[in-house]
């Protein structure tokens, strides 16, 4: 069972649903990245384009032991890639970390973080149609 989302997401946070049924949150901008992080639990998975600017994506899990299928990891990575500096490439390198290892930096712009422990880094295809396919009412 997945944790329910709070009613009324902030305007700057987009909701997607992976084909495996996981809720995926993506910030629309720096403030949206901050808002998405605040909605996440320590055991949720955080994704971001490697070595450059982009949106944060959160994969919500019911608990820390809940496995996330490869397809969901790739789809969430694709959503991160579509709103990153790698959006025009064929593939993008995405980093993955548990939220407990993602820390906001003080005295910096909203959405700037430090990652203490990355558990994966992988290339995913950049597919802009993915955004439409994973919308909740698509």
Question: What residue ranges belong to the model's regions?
Answer:
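Duplex nucleic acid-engaging cores and interfaces of nucleic-acid transaction enzymes
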Residues: 1-138
